[in-house]
A protein has these predicted regions:
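TRNA-recognition modules of translation machinery and tRNA-sensing kinases, especially anticodon-binding
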Residues: 2-232
Length: 232
């Protein structure tokens, strides 16, 4: 069974399907689970909780999806959570520069590389727009954070790109109120949001998606004392 067969079966049986599909302006990268899909997702989460969270006596939280600007300034997301993009001067189509280069020249450039490196390869390999063959502009960085405005004062905030942020900022309170001691594991299941340049392959690269995440806090000077640490 290939990818197209899986997609056809999923849509026919209502496992999952595009969000807002009855309207012509629906955006890519947003999918919804039907009844069967929800059942499968819930079974996975129950297994995850049973085999990891409850077995190792971890704490589970449910943090906010919208968080303050300060959180992401401290984490570095506002400055570094970005992908290299390049736009066609003719048809204005936008592409991920690293993927376009890999698809057309089979040259792999890490997305963290300097922008000048992308521009150089595009010029040397005479890479053009894959849609209209037009000339490409200079490569730029595109931040994938979803910005939102809070209240009538329009205070700047962001949808979280990962579930770990709540775990980190809530750790001091959790450690105190739960009378924790190191090592301690904190888990969270919830939605994250990334303004992907080119969401694709249905559930594999989304702009809104679920994450099940665990962070383990420990004393770095006592790693050898941790049970099963050598198995990680």
């Amino acid at each position: 069974m290939n990818y197209e067969d899986v997609m056809k079966l999923a849509l026919e049986r209502g496992f999952y399907f595009p969000s807002c599909e009855v309207y012509g302006d629906a955006h890519a990268g947003f999918w919804e689970y039907g009844p069967t899909g929800v059942s499968i997702k819930n079974k996975f989460l129950e297994l995850w909780r049973r085999q990891l969270v409850r077995r190792d006596r971890m704490l589970e939280i449910d943090g906010s999806q919208i968080m303050s600007k300060s959180v992401f300034e401290a984490s570095g997301h506002l400055g570094n959570f970005a992908d290299p993009i390049v736009k066609c001067k003719k048809c204005k189509s936008t592409f991920r520069a690293d993927k376009l280069i890999a698809d057309t020249s089979e040259i792999e450039i890490p997305e963290s590389a300097d922008l000048k490196e992308f521009d150089q390869v595009i010029r040397e390999k005479a890479i053009s727009c894959s849609k209209c063959n037009g000339e490409l502009d200079e490569v730029k960085k595109f931040n994938m954070m979803f910005k939102v405005w809070i209240g009538p004062e329009e205070e700047e905030a962001y949808l979280r790109p990962e579930t770990c942020q709540s775990i980190f900022v809530d750790f001091p309170r959790l450690f105190k109120t739960m009378r924790g001691k190191l090592p301690i594991g904190i888990a969270q299941v919830g939605k994250s949001f990334r303004n992907e340049i080119a969401p694709r392959q249905s559930l594999l690269r989304l702009r809104e998606f679920y994450q099940a995440e665990i962070e383990v806090f420990c004393n770095p000077t006592k790693l050898d004392d941790l049970e099963k640490f050598s198995e990680v």
